Amino acid sequence: TLIGPKGLERVVNALRVIAPELPFPIIFKEITQNEQDFEVKGYHIHAFRVQHNVTCYGYTIQIPRAGRFHAEKAKELGIPLTFWSHLQKGETMTDGDKVYTPDMVMGEKRKEIKVTYVTDTRPLPIIAEQAKDADLFICEGMYGEPDKLAKAKEYKHMTFSEAASLAKEAQP
């Protein structure tokens, strides 16, 4: 699944001229709003518009995490080892008249993993808002030298120090 601005499918299909055969299908999801949410294979993806010379978005991806598997509890209950991975995936298993459910051996859900990714933009408040408490924040910084600030503003990019300031703001 590819998520991106309007015209994404046209651009990718033009590139497929050089790689027409792919071993997987491509599903396109075009962003039509300044902020938009998507659910893809259990992941929650929030796209948000950033400031660049062409339409560009940042993304926050939230990955849910199941609770920890309690192997000792599974052993105590006599659950066959071959069922363990199924129970960890949330599946109910039966063995004759015995029924084993995930809640018998799984702990509470753990904190989700949060990743925020932005590229090609000037600093914006929404970036720090989206990156707040992220486990990983990937942020562009096109110019390392402070004297390149005017160039960064002209071409709608960030300096390293601007990117670092956003990261600091996101992790109070």
Predicted regions and their residues:
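Non-catalytic surface loops within mature trypsin-like serine protease
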Residues: 6, 32-33, 63-65
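A short helix-to-beta-strand connector/capping loop
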Residues: 21-27, 40-41, 112-113
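Active-site-proximal loop/helix segment associated with metal-binding centers of metalloenzymes
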Residues: 43-117, 121-130, 136-141
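Short loop/edge segments at beta-strand edges and connector loops
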Residues: 30-32, 119
